[in-house]
Each structure stands twice: as C-alpha cells, then as structure tokens.
C-alpha cells in the first residue's frame, strides 16, 4: 500500500497566481516537489486547491482536483470522500454594497449577480441553490461495483454546485476573499454594534402566547438575536457592518446620514415577518433576557423555537403572570431577588438580564392561578392546557442544559415542583424536587457561608433558597406520603429571620407600578414585614412536620394484601409502640407553634380589613396566606392524629388517647371546611395551591363518616360540610389533576357505602354520569362565576345572603376552642333552620344553594339508610376496613382506584 506521505497529488490549476509564503512548513524528503524554492535550500511546494475533509484533517496531500472524487487516499483507505464548501468568500452580497457605497461616494454599488458566487475555474456549471445556502457532498467508494455513491447533502452557506458527470462537487467561491476567521470576527463585531445601538428601553420584543403557537415577535419590538441570524433589512445591515469594520469617523458618518438610517422598529418589522414560518430565524429574545448560551448550536436553537420554548408572553399576559407570582407564589417560596428580577423587565436597570429558564419557570408557576378569561383570550381552553404548554417550555430548556448557573437551576427546579400531571408521568413533583435538592447540595446551600458573607445580599438569597427547599420538601412529603429527603442533622443553615428578607428599602418606581400595590411593595415596609413573618412561621411549622413524618411514619416493608395502592406506598404509619415516645412530643410542638403565633399572623374567621383600594389588595393578599398557613397546620394535625383514630393493628390503643385524637381530627375537618367557605366567599379559591387538595379531601371523608352518625343533627350538619368540601374540590378540578383523583375517590366511596344524596346525584336511579352532571349544574349555577379577573384578590366577602346573626357567628371568636381554634359542633348552640339543620357558620352558602335548588325542603325529604334510621352506632374501625382505604386516600394521590372496588 502506498504510504500517506508518498501518495500522488496534483498541483492546483491556479498555482502561478499564488505568491511563495515563507511560512510554508518543510516537507518530508521524498514528497512531491513541483515548485522547488532556492531560498534556504528548502523544498517548498504549493498547497492543493481543493482537499477532501479526510485529507485535510490528516494534513496530507489530496488529489481530488485531478482525478475527481474519491481521492487516492480515501479510495485506498476505504473511507468516505467528503468535499466541503470553502469557507472563504462567504460574504453577504449586502455587505459588498455597504463597503462599496461607504468607500466611494461617486458611484453607486453594483447589484450582485448570481454568477458572482460561481468559481470561474469550473468548466461547466449547473444552477445551484439560492445565495445563502450550499451543499456538502459525500462520495462513498464501492470496490465491489466500482461505482461512487452520492450521500445526502448538508446545508451550508454561499456556494454553488458544479456537475461532473454523475458526481456533484463543490466549487470554491471567490478564492481571493478573506478567510473564515475574518468572517467570524465580522459577524461578532456586527452583533456587538447591533446590541449597542438598540437601547433596552426602546421597544420590547414580545410574542402572543397561544396554546400551540409559533413564536411571533410583535411589531416594533427590540430584540437580541443569535449570531447566526441574518439581518432582515439590508440598509441597516450595511451601516452596522461598515461601522463594525471602519468606525464612525473613518466612514465619514454624519448626522444627516444618521437621520436617514432606518429606525429599529422597521428593522424588527422585517424580522417579525420572517418569523412566522417554522424554519425561519425565531431565535429573537427581548433585551432583558440573557443571551443564548454558547454551547447551543443553530440546530438546538431551532429545535427550541419549534418547541415554543423561546416564546415570551406579550406585555399584558407577562405582567399579569408576574403579579400573580409576587402575590401568590413568592411569599411562601422567596427563592429569588425580586428587585433584581423585575428591574430588567421594567427597564429600571440597563445592566442586568434575566435567565430564560427562570423566566419561563416563573411564568409556568403563575399560570395556574391566573384568571381563566384572560387565558381564553390567548387561545387556551382551560388552565390545565396552559400549564402543559408553559411547563413544556421549562422542561425542554432544562433538559437541553440551557442554564449553567446552579443557583438559577435550584430556583427554577423549585418552581417546576408545581407540576403534577398523573401518576404515569415519572417526571412529576417528586422527581423535580429530588433534582432541586441534589443541585442545592452540589452548590453547598445546606451550609451557611462564613460570618462576613452571611449578611451580604448573596448570603441572604442563599439562605432563602435553602429554606424554600426545606419548606417544599416537607409539604410534598406531607401531601404525597413520601419520606422527606432533608434530615434536620444534615444541614447547618440558621433559621430564617427578618434580616434575610429585603423589606427595608422600597423597590424602584417602575417595579411598584408593575405590581400596582404601592403600600404593599413600596414606602410602607409594615406589610412586607408581615408577609415575611408568615414565611418564617411556615418554616418553623415545617420543622414539626418533618418530625411527624420521621417519627410517626416509616418506609413500607411489605406490600399489603389485595390493595394496589399498598404495593406502591412509600410510607405507612408506625406501630403504636414506635409512635408512643414521640407522639406526645409532636402534638405538644404543634400546639406550641399555634400558641406562639403573633397576632398579626393568626387567622381569625370572618375578620376582614377595609380601607383604600390598595390597602384592600394587600390585606386580602395577607389574609390569603394566613388561610393557607392555617390550612397547612390543620393538615399536619390530621397526619399526626389519623393513625391513632384508624389504627387497625393488633396492639391496643389507649381509649382516652384515641378519643382525643378523634376529637382533634374532627375539629381540624370543621376548620378546613370553614377555610374553604372563606376562600370561596372571597373569590380566592383560584389561588389555592395543590396542598389544599389533600386538606379538602381529608375533611370531606371525615364528614362522610359523620353523615352515617345516628344523631340526626350531626348527620345533617355533616351533609352540608361534606358538600362544601366537595364543592371546593370541584373548583380545583380545573387546575389540578389531583383534584380529579380526589373527587373520584369520594365518588367511589359514596357508591360503595350506599349513600343516597339526591342533591349530589348519589344513590339516585339515574346513571352515574347524569348524577354528576346534575350535581355540577345545581352547585355551580348557584355559585356563579368567580369575581376575580386580575391578580388582586377581591377583599369583598359574598355575605349578602346572610342575616346579622349568621354574620356574628362567623366573625365571633369561639369560646372554649381547642388547639385548632374551633370547637366541635356539638359544643355550641345552633340556630334552627327550615332546611337541613346546619350551623350557618359551617356552610351558609350551601343553605342558599339548597333552597334555590328546591330539592330538599325539610328533614323528611332526605332519604337515609335504614340502619341509621334505626339508630345503629357506626364503628369507625370496622367500616369498610377504613384504615386501608381512607388513610391512603388522605395522604397520597399517586395511586390507582382499583382498591376501592375490591
């Protein structure tokens, strides 16, 4: 075989036109020397005009020009002979016009012709692709047939095809032009000058966000494009390229020329027009978004554009989503610096930018709580469809490694934990929480910084991010019945304090105008301090929740018999002996937490603050988070005392302790029902998080048990409370898949238990589907649509249908209340009613609904099971093996429903 160093080659046809270069490397002895040089007695020869990719990489001489492809080297080595387009001379024709016009004002520039890019050395030329594209052809050698196979062409820029019989080669374009390194430098300088000319506050590039949209930059939007993007306006491109190479004064640029330059809006009009097609350059981002990372190539960015990941909501939708995030999501997850995030968006700062991954994560976390009418204007059918679209953007950006900063990754992953679609989706809440904690540990957030750095801006942010991880981990463990990942002895970060929150200095005016609540985010720091205290109280509650999960529950060791759920359960209650030494301590910790709450952090039923419109907005927001904090406390009570009530093991439980746990569990269910009424009456149910679903389900199932009570008064009151919780779950169905599963659990249990509730379509001769439709039509027609249309919770309660005595009972403190803040229904006086005998404080809105429905006018109209009419006492421990049905249902929605029918 001929060695690579001695293989034949040919001299290029234009060898006489090239000057000798003293930098030509010395060739080995025995190599071909067609052009010897006398200088230094060194054998110097000219480079071949063309070389295939393989020979170029190996730095050996190629004879593809003489013999045609495949070359001798590729033929002997049996490799593909790939001819690649020359990187020289790939200039945009518009640049030639700019340089000609700016260097000589006497003559007009010549318009480029299609023949400018065709190599004059070619004998025969075939029509090639349009300017701006090219092909690289692969020639495969086939020794068995002695033929050459042509591979798939790959798109490139600025070359033409030349036909050679059945083979297609690529000819060089303008051999005398600058090389590719100069072209890259020109493109980079052009981008820098382009960015410097467009001010951040000129016009914001934006796109309308639809359910399956293509990114469409709005008219007149100033954007940042990738270096691969080609200017859409030739005149503007001429000026920018010439400016990058020669400068203002070298070009003789005058103020008159500047006035004749096209404005940025016209430039972006052309870009918008070209962005409507899937394959157009759609990589434009607003100036407040950080540039694309360098490791993503053109194909990655095109993929992200096709997948809608680069779509930025327009100003109206974006601002509303930001307000939702600040008022609803941020207070209990203060994992970002609000001012640093909002200043670039509002134009208050020209220095910072926002990570695209974090921006899209915030948009996703907020879209759940936005008004449905606004989403429908953008083409979304429901909130679930909007959640899917917004989450897909964040997931693809993360999967492609778009963001490299670990702090930003933790912030984004925490927001991604709001995603839960179904149990079949392996990448749901638990998965993203694990990634967030892993990244946080890699970044070292579990350890405090050194003393001088703790109180810096970055130190406070790191501490808030870590405690956001702790809070989220505890709440997910409580709601998903999973073991919490963070152990108390595995981190050394101090507890949150007010100094960790930026509450002293007011934000810039533009940020305050965006949030539209000056006293909440502006001059008066009192309300910001109250919100920070609520977050601190939640972090302290999560300490106790963590102890409950660690001491009262354990990893399931063996699958349960006959239950699909138990085969998949992660934790189950411990035995009574294991619980005994820690149960009393956890119960005391919960009561101590509740007693130590400051008065401004304590939820008072029916208490509402009035005042100016701005004060109503902020007070309503603070009240919303008081309700959510109280609901999490009640859910923790249920997780602690439920195993005591529904324990079915062989160990005997103290009757007094069991009775006390049953009382507290019922109190918690009653209190959660009142919270549901408060949220509905204020129009704030649309802001309830996913953690409210297990809370309402827990309360509904406790009321469902009390419906079978032999006491008529308790039974009728429990029906109203059950309806209130079920109605709340129905409202949450438009937001969360978990609410669907919770309603499904309740429907199966009521059918299996043989309940007959005509109002809810349960137990009627009609079909199940008709019963559900009848129930929904009656309930929701009486409630009517939500009054909330923006991010500002409505402070006005819907109490027009209540009389004075009912209002007093709602707002009056309950004497003798237990640790949950409410007393049992049987321990206080009630007012008689013509309908089902419910306390007005329990569900007064359901009374008006039932009255309007006209189905139930007296106690005799409600069909009841015969055993209850006979006064048979219900044994909670024996009813449908309640320990294996209700307890899993209250704690976990990641389960099938087959066990309900077993």
UniProtKB/Swiss-Prot annotation:
Ranges annotated as biased composition (Acidic residues): 168-177
Claim: Isomerase is one of the keywords in the record: no
Molecular-function annotations in GO: DNA binding; DNA-binding transcription factor activity, RNA polymerase II-specific; zinc ion binding
DNA-binding region (UniProt annotation): 52-81
Listed GO CC annotations: nucleus
KO phenotype (gene knockout): Reduces significantly the induction of the FBD cluster gene FPSE_08120 in response to 2-aminophenol (2-AP) treatment.
Region (Disordered) location: 1-47, 92-189, 208-234, 258-277, 820-839
Gene Ontology biological process terms in this record: DNA-templated transcription
Induction details: Expression is induced in response to 2-benzoxasolinone (BOA) exposure. Expression is also induced in response to 6-methoxy-2-benzoxazolinone (MBOA) and 2-aminophenol (2-AP) treatment.
Bias (Low complexity) ranges: 120-137
Pfam families: Fungal_trans, Zn_clus
InterPro entries documented for this protein: Fungal_Detox/Toxin_TFs, Transcription_factor_dom_fun, Zn2-C6_fun-type_DNA-bd_sf, Zn2Cys6_DnaBD
Keywords: Metal-binding, Nucleus, Zinc
Compositional bias of kind Polar residues: 178-187, 220-234, 262-277, 826-839
Primary localisation category: nucleus
Annotated PANTHER family: FARB-RELATED (PTHR47425), ZN(II)2CYS6 TRANSCRIPTION FACTOR (EUROFUNG) (PTHR47425:SF3)
Protein name: Transcription factor FPSE_08121
Organism of this sequence: Fusarium pseudograminearum (strain CS3096) (Wheat and barley crown-rot fungus)
Higher taxonomy: Eukaryota, Fungi, Dikarya, Ascomycota, Pezizomycotina
């Amino acid at each position: 075989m001929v060695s690579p160093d001695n293989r034949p080659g040919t001299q290029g046809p234009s060898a006489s036109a090239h000057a000798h270069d003293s930098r030509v490397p010395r060739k080995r002895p025995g190599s071909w020397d067609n052009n010897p040089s006398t200088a230094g007695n060194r054998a110097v020869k000219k480079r071949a005009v063309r070389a295939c990719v393989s020979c170029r990489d190996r730095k050996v001489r190629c004879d593809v020009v003489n013999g045609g492809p495949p070359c001798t080297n590729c033929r002997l080595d049996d490799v593909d002979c790939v001819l690649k387009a020359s990187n020289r001379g790939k200039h945009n024709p518009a640049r030639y016009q700019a340089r000609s016009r700016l260097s000589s004002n006497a003559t007009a520039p010549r318009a480029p012709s299609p023949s400018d890019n065709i190599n004059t050395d070619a004998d025969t030329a075939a029509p090639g692709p349009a300017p701006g594209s090219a092909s690289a052809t692969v020639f495969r050698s086939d020794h068995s047939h002695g033929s050459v196979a042509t591979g798939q062409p790959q798109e490139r820029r600025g070359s033409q095809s030349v036909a050679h019989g059945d083979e297609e080669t690529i000819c060089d374009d303008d051999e005398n032009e600058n090389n590719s390194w100069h072209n890259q430098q020109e493109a980079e300088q052009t981008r820098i000058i382009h960015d410097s000319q467009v001010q951040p506050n000129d016009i914001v590039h934006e796109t309308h966000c639809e359910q399956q949209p293509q990114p469409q930059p709005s008219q007149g939007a100033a954007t940042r494009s990738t270096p691969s993007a080609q200017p859409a306006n030739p005149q503007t491109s001429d000026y920018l390229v010439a400016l990058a190479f020669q400068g203002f004064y070298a070009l003789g640029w005058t103020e008159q020329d500047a006035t004749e330059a096209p404005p940025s809006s016209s430039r972006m009009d052309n870009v918008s027009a070209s962005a409507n097609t899937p394959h157009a350059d759609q990589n434009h981002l607003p100036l407040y978004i950080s540039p694309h990372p360098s490791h993503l190539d053109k194909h990655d960015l095109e993929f992200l554009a096709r997948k809608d990941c680069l779509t930025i909501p327009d100003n109206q939708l974006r601002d509303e989503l930001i307000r939702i995030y600040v008022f609803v999501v941020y207070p209990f997850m203060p994992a970002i610096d609000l001012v640093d995030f909002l200043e670039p968006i509002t134009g208050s700062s020209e220095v910072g930018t926002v990570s695209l991954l974090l921006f899209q994560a915030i948009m996703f976390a907020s879209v759940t709580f936005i008004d449905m009418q606004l989403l429908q204007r953008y083409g979304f059918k429901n909130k679930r469809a909007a959640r899917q679209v917004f989450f897909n953007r964040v997931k693809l950006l993360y999967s492609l490694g778009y963001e490299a900063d670990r702090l930003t990754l933790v912030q984004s992953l925490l927001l991604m934990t709001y995603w839960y679609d179904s149990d079949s989706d392996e990448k749901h809440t638990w998965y993203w929480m694990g990634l967030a904690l892993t990244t946080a540990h890699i970044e070292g957030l579990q350890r405090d910084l050194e003393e001088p750095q703790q109180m810096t801006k970055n130190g406070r942010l790191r501490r808030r991010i870590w405690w956001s991880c702790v809070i989220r981990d505890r709440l997910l463990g409580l709601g998903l019945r999973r073991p919490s990942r963070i152990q108390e002895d595995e981190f050394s970060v101090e507890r949150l304090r007010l100094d960790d929150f930026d509450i002293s200095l007011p934000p810039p005016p533009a940020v305050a105008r965006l949030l539209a609540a000056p006293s909440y985010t502006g001059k008066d720091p009192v309300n910001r301090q109250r919100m920070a205290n609520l977050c601190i109280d939640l972090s302290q509650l999560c300490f106790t929740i963590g102890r409950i999960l660690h001491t009262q529950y354990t990893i399931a060791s063996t699958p349960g018999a006959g239950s699909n759920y138990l085969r998949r359960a992660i934790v189950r209650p411990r035995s009574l002996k294991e619980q005994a030494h820690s149960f009393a301590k956890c119960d005391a910790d919960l009561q101590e937490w509740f007693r130590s709450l400051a008065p401004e952090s304590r939820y008072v039923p029916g208490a509402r603050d009035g005042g100016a419109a701005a004060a109503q907005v902020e007070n309503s927001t603070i009240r919303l988070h008081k309700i959510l904090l109280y609901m999490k406390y009640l859910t923790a009570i249920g997780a602690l005392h439920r195993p005591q009530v529904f324990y079915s093991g062989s160990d005997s439980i103290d009757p007094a302790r069991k009775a006390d746990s049953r009382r507290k569990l019922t109190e918690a269910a009653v209190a959660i029902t009142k919270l549901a009424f408060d949220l509905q009456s204020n129009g704030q149910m649309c802001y309830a998080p996913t953690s409210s679903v297990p809370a309402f389900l827990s309360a509904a199932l406790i009321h469902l048990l009390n419906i079978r009570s032999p006491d008529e008064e308790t039974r009728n009151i429990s029906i109203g409370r059950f309806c209130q919780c079920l109605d709340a779950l129905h409202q949450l169905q438009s937001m969360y898949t978990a609410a669907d599963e919770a309603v499904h659990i309740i429907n199966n249990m009521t059918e299996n238990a043989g309940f007959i509730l005509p109002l809810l379509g349960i137990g009627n001769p009609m079909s199940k589907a008709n019963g559900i439709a009848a129930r929904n039509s009656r309930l929701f027609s009486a409630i009517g649509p939500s009054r909330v249309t923006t991010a500002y919770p409505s402070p006005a309660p819907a109490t027009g249908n209540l009389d004075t005595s009912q209002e007093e009972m709602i707002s009056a403190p309950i004497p003798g209340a237990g640790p949950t803040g409410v007393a049992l229904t049987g321990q206080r006086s009630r007012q008689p009613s013509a309908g089902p005998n419910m306390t007005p404080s329990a569900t007064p809105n359901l009374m008006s609904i039932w009255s309007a429905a006209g189905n139930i006018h007296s106690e005799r109209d409600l069909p009841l099971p015969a055993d209850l009419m006979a006064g048979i006492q219900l044994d909670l421990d024996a009813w449908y093996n309640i320990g294996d049905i209700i307890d899993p249902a209250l704690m976990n929605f990641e389960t099938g429903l087959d066990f309900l029918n077993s």
